[in-house]
């Protein structure tokens, strides 16, 4: 598995909050899915509320 850096933003109390997460995944699509799942469980956000701008290997 490779390590991917996923950058994006999500709505916070006062505007948008930028984020950068490092995740291990076999490909970029799985890395995005893991970020969606992580933010959904930790912050209670829906997938449509999370904007992923960039995925780097």
From Swiss-Prot:
One of its GO terms (molecular function) is large ribosomal subunit rRNA binding. The keyword Membrane does not apply. One of its GO terms (cellular component) is ribosome. GO terms for biological process: translation. Coiled coil: none annotated. It holds the Pfam family Ribosomal_L18A. Keywords: Ribonucleoprotein, Ribosomal protein, RNA-binding, rRNA-binding. Belongs to the eukaryotic ribosomal protein eL20 family. Part of the 50S ribosomal subunit. Binds 23S rRNA. This is Large ribosomal subunit protein eL20.
């Amino acid at each position: 598995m490779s390590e991917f850096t996923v950058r994006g933003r999500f709505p916070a109390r006062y505007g948008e909050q930028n984020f950068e997460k490092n995740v291990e995944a076999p490909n970029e699509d799985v890395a995005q899915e893991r970020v969606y799942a992580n933010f959904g469980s930790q912050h209670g956000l829906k997938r449509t509320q999370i904007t992923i701008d960039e995925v780097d290997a």
